[in-house]
Amino acid sequence: MGAGPYRLLDTRYGIDAPAKRVGAGGTLAVKVAGIGGIPLGATSVLVNLTGTGPTATTHLTAFGAGSLPGVMNLNLATGETRTVLAVIPLDSNGYIHIHNANGSVNVIADLEGSFG
């Protein structure tokens, strides 16, 4: 488990994504392998995932490849800020994907380490 801490994403300020909120049904693809000390061969990462200021009750789901899984990582009520530590698999190109269900929300992802 190397690397970290490193800010991978912050939609409030345009870090690795446009400086705008993630809309309902929106999914961000975030490059991780080779970033912030993560080796290109990493298979998963430990990420501190934060949602802040949602306009509706929502949930964030972080995942690797394939279709959206049926589980969520972080539940948020309107206007609140919450954080969760999650192990997220990387897709074959070294990305993680973060999906917002409802309303719009700012998303922050801080890398804490990697596996594999």
Feature-to-residue mapping (PLM):
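Short edge beta-strands and adjacent beta->alpha junctions
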Residues: M1-G116
